[in-house]
């Protein structure tokens, strides 16, 4: 459909009845969707989504949590896909019936619906060409198009027939299983009868086989035709599966969010018909218990690949002697990596919607790998559900078999899309890792050097040279123990990529070729296997030379009791040890191939070489997002809180070359009644102290006292849970100590039991559990303590992914504006990059300055959005800083909050506004009964997955 075109299909808006989607009209809001209960706001959401997909736009959609965003995405996107496929079939039927294709001067772009039409009809002809030549070329193009459509239609018909057979096969599966069991019982009875006859008094016993001779006995023969009949696989199946139909890739951040989305698909009107497949990591989908027990993601990945390659390499010579087939089945040591069984798993996964847990159970039952089986289902799937880290990383995307050409991508929970893309492609390596990798590689060459070919030796020596120069640029010596090396110069140095290559004296090495060699040879995996097998042999050598090697081997062993007893630092607890230092360094080498203007290298020289680091900082995340936008038909970026949208427009879309006209914004209001939320901006405190928590003023005693007094007053009128966010952990500790010293903490404790967010990720769930239990107890006991106060940190463990719905968060307080550290070298470099790259809009701040404000407001929006989580929820939001009253700042709040904000110049009217609504807003209104403890724990699951993925 072209933007501004006419209507296609009947259009109508009805009441809360069951609808049938039948078309779209861009100049009308009349759309009917297949969903039983559909609020008007959700109709607008789905109608706009449909238009974005039809017109091939880039959409930024905001729909607050609890407003039915997932269901709207499902119904809007799948309705478009269904209509798209229907129009494609109708157009193909018309072309096949008439035997002619569309000419180049036809205006309706929707006639050429398939990628197979590209380059067929409509080829511009040179000026002055004879008419008969033009007519001949057009006729030939039309015939070619019709022939292609016939072939495509035949393939689609075969695929649909096979999928119908698959659905029928799933229904007959258990009946066939019972027949197999009966057959096995019959065979067992026959075998027992033969044994009884053979063991008779006059029976002649066969000669006892010697050890090893069992392998010489012929196994039961089964022909290829019998296997084919048993599995239902025909010769053309591979060809059918290779064709990627038009599909929707739906991405989200965590596996739990994806599972929830799949559950919503099952409940939707499309649940019985859509072909859906869920993709995940090996850690989530592996069914081999020996591999799963390794725990670490990298260890699981290494072992999986090694098990696939080991037997294949051993039997490579024997396979070459066999008659070559069109596609040979790989030999694999893993019993679940069986192509025939994985094909069956693929078929059953497409027959009906399954989430990841069901896919895992199916893999165990069928003894097939769900990780690879799910990838086999991608071509025929209509809806592919996957973590968006898998989509944004080009190598992972290619390895998974994901093809984005002319497809639709929907990225849900996309508020952290820029940060995730940046962190995925930013790499930091330590001096200790560089020395460990160098020592391992030297030992590997000593062991196998005589068996290696010249080209292998050449690349290994280049890698050794690179490692040596990386250590040298930090000021260390590769031959000495990194833990005992003290650096003469300390501090941080930031360089462009080219300057770093020149300073390191590695500008003469082709890093692209080295990166390719590492990928193809899998040297890091082989090196890790080498350290596992022979680490003990080399541990007897002198300590200084092999310190890095031994330290790596020791890191693989369980920690000692003393180490476990020591308090773990937050960064150490959240970052797992890599399986191989070289594997991590390969990521750094790949990052150095980025364009010079898109990244920087930060040299951080600490006291010792082992603590010093080299970090690649990606400045332009759009360079990795541009390929997605370029290939896809349409891209939708959706989330509960997408403000400030200018962040996405500038850093992600404008830098990716997306024209402003192609970007469509849509913000959906909240479904809660207007009086269910009370957002306040308080400009001065109880003692009329102006509230402006700048870096220079926030440490003043009177400012910290004002926060305490305001909280005391709020806790006196708000029943239930109060969550107060501070800009940083350090400031929270400082304020807490000041309150304790001045007595304000005791006054607060008399009204609310006080909880404090832990810095360790492992203690978050415990604190949340105690907090929710305290609120439940206070609700049952009418005493002086009316609830609990949770002191949290913006950007911490509880500002994202934890839902403070209902009584868990009746009031959310934001202390100050949580601006990022402006003195950070990384932030300053990003600001400078944006100032140089993006133009300054008239009347707007410089792009670099706007970035700082956007980062602040994004953190604020994520924190205050924790309170309202469903339609019948209610809470107050208090922003303690007069800077929130500025129009440019208010404009970056979510629309549903911004429309209801009340700015109070003094504290008196503010607390009066809270007191005015208190009798009905907090005490008398009955909220929906919910299990706060289980809800808190489910919310904490998001944080566990987030920590694991990081």
Swiss-Prot record:
Cofactor(s), names only, from the UniProt record: [4Fe-4S] cluster
EC number: 5.6.2.-
GO biological process, alphabetically ordered: establishment of sister chromatid cohesion; nucleobase-containing compound metabolic process
Region annotation Disordered: where it falls in the sequence: 191-213, 220-239, 308-331
Highest taxon of source: Eukaryota
Keyword Magnesium: no
Compositionally biased spans, kind Basic and acidic residues: 191-208, 308-323
InterPro entries: ATP-dep_Helicase_C, DinG/Rad3-like, Helic_SF1/SF2_ATP-bd_DinG/Rad3, Helicase-like_DEXD_c2, P-loop_NTPase, RAD3-like_helicase_DEAD, Rad3/Chl1-like
Entry note: cofactor: Binds 1 [4Fe-4S] cluster.
Annotated GO MF terms: ATP binding; DNA binding; DNA helicase activity; hydrolase activity, acting on acid anhydrides, in phosphorus-containing anhydrides; iron-sulfur cluster binding; metal ion binding; RNA binding; RNA helicase activity
Residues reported to bind ATP: 63-70
Residue ranges occupied by any Helicase ATP-binding domain in the UniProt entry: 28-464
Binding site for [4Fe-4S] cluster: 286, 304, 334, 369
Tissue expression from the record: Only transcribed in proliferating tissues; the probe used detects both DDX11 and DDX12P.
Keywords, in A-Z order: ATP-binding, Cell cycle, DNA-binding, Helicase, Hydrolase, Iron, Iron-sulfur, Isomerase, Metal-binding, Nucleotide-binding, Nucleus, RNA-binding
One Gene Ontology cellular component: nucleus
Major subcellular site: nucleus
Stated role: DNA helicase involved in cellular proliferation. Probably required for maintaining the chromosome segregation.
Listed name of the protein: Putative ATP-dependent DNA helicase DDX12
GN (gene name): DDX12P
């Amino acid at each position: 459909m072209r933007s501004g075109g006419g209507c296609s299909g009947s259009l109508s808006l009805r009441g809360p009845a069951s609808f049938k989607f039948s078309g779209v009209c861009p100049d009308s809001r009349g759309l009917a969707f297949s969903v039983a209960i559909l609020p008007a706001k959700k109709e607008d959401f789905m109608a706009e989504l449909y238009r974005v997909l039809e017109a091939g736009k880039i959409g930024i959609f905001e729909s607050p949590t609890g407003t039915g965003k997932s269901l709207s995405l499902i119904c809007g996107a799948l309705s478009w896909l269904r209509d798209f496929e229907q129009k494609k079939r109708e157009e193909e039927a018309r072309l096949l019936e008439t035997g002619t294709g569309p000419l180049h001067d036809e205006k309706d772009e929707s006639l050429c619906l398939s990628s197979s039409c590209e380059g067929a009809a409509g080829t511009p002809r040179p000026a002055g060409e004879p008419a008969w030549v033009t007519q001949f070329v057009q006729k030939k193009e039309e015939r070619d198009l019709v022939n292609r459509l016939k072939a495509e239609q035949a393939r689609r018909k075969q695929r649909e027939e096979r999928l119908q057979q698959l659905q029928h096969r799933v229904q007959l599966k258990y009946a066939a299983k019972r027949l197999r069991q009966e057959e096995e019982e019959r065979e067992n009875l026959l075998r027992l009868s033969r044994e009884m006859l053979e063991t008779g008094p006059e029976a002649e016993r066969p000669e006892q086989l010697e050890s090893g001779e069992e392998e010489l006995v012929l196994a039961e023969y089964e022909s290829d035709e019998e296997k084919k009949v048993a599995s239902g696989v025909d010769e053309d199946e591979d060809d059918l599966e290779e064709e990627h139909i038009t599909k929707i890739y739906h991405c989200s951040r965590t596996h739990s969010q994806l599972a929830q989305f799949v559950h919503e698909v099952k409940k939707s009107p499309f649940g019985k018909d859509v072909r859906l497949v869920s993709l995940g990591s090996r850690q989530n989908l592996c069914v081999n218990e020996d591999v799963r027990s390794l725990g670490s993601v990298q260890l699981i990945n290494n072992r999986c690949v090694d098990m696939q390659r080991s037997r294949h390499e051993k039997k490579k010579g024997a396979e070459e002697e066999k008659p070559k087939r069109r596609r040979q089945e790989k030999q694999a040591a893993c019993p679940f990596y069986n192509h025939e069984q994985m094909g069956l798993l693929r078929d059953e996964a497409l027959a009906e919607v399954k989430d990841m847990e069901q896919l895992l159970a199916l893999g165990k039952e069928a003894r097939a790998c769900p990780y690879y089986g799910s990838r086999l289902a991608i071509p025929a799937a209509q809806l592919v559900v996957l973590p968006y880290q898998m989509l944004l990383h080009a190598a992972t995307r290619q390895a998974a078999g994901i093809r984005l050409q002319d497809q639709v991508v929907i990225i849900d929970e996309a508020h952290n899309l820029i940060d995730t893309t940046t962190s995925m492609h930013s790499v930091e390596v330590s001096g200790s890792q560089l020395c460990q990798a160098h020592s391992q590689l030297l030992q590997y060459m000593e062991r196998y050097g005589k068996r290696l070919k010249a080209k292998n030796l050449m690349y290994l020596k280049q890698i050794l040279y690179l490692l040596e120069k990386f250590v040298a640029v930090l000021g260390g010596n590769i031959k000495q123990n990194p833990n005992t090396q003290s650096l003469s110069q300390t501090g941080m140095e930031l360089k462009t990529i080219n300057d770093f290559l020149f300073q390191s004296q590695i500008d003469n090495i082709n890093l692209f070729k080295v990166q390719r060699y590492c990928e193809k040879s899998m040297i890091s995996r082989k090196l890790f296997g080498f350290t596992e097998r022979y680490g003990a042999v080399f541990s007897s050598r002198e300590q200084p030379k092999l310190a890095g090697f031994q330290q790596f081997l020791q890191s693989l062993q369980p920690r000692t009791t003393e180490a476990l007893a020591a308090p773990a630092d937050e960064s150490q607890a959240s970052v797992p040890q890599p399986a191989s230092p070289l594997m991590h360094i390969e990521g750094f080498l790949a990052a150095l191939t980025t364009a010079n203007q898109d990244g920087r290298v930060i040299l951080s020289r600490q006291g010792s070489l082992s603590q010093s680091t080299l970090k690649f900082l990606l400045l332009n995340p759009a360079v990795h997002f541009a390929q997605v936008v370029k290939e896809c038909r349409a891209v939708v970026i959706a989330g509960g809180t997408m403000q400030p949208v200018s962040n996405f427009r500038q850093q992600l879309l404008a830098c990716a070359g997306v024209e402003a006209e192609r970007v469509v914004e849509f913000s959906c209001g909240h479904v809660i009644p207007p009086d269910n939320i009370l957002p306040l901006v308080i400009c001065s405190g109880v003692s009329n102290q102006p509230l402006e928590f700048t870096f220079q003023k926030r440490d003043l005693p009177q400012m910290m006292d004002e926060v305490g007094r305001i909280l005391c007053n709020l806790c006196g009128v708000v029943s239930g849970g109060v969550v107060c966010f501070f800009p940083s952990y350090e400031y929270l500790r400082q304020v807490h100590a000041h309150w304790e010293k001045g007595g304000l903490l005791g006054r607060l404790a008399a009204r609310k039991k006080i909880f404090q967010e832990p810095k360790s990720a492992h203690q978050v769930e415990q604190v949340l559990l105690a907090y929710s239990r305290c609120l439940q107890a206070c609700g049952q006991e009418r005493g002086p303590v009316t609830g609990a106060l949770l002191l949290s940190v913006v950007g911490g463990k509880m500002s994202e992914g934890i839902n403070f719905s209902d009584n868990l968060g009746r009031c959310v307080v934001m202390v100050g504006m949580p601006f990022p550290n402006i003195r950070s070298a990384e932030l300053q470099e990003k600001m400078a990059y944006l100032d140089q790259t993006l133009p300054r809009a008239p009347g707007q701040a410089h792009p670099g300055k706007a970035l700082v404000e956007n980062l602040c407001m994004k953190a604020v929006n994520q924190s205050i959005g924790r309170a309202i989580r469903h339609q019948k929820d209610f809470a107050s939001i208090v922003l303690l800083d007069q800077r929130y009253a500025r129009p440019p700042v208010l404009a970056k709040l979510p629309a549903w909050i911004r429309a209801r904000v009340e700015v109070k110049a003094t504290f008196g009217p503010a607390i009066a506004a809270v007191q005015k609504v208190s009798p009905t807003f907090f005490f008398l209104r009955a909220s929906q009964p919910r299990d706060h403890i289980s809800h808190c724990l489910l919310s904490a699951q998001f944080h566990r997955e987030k920590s694991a993925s990081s």
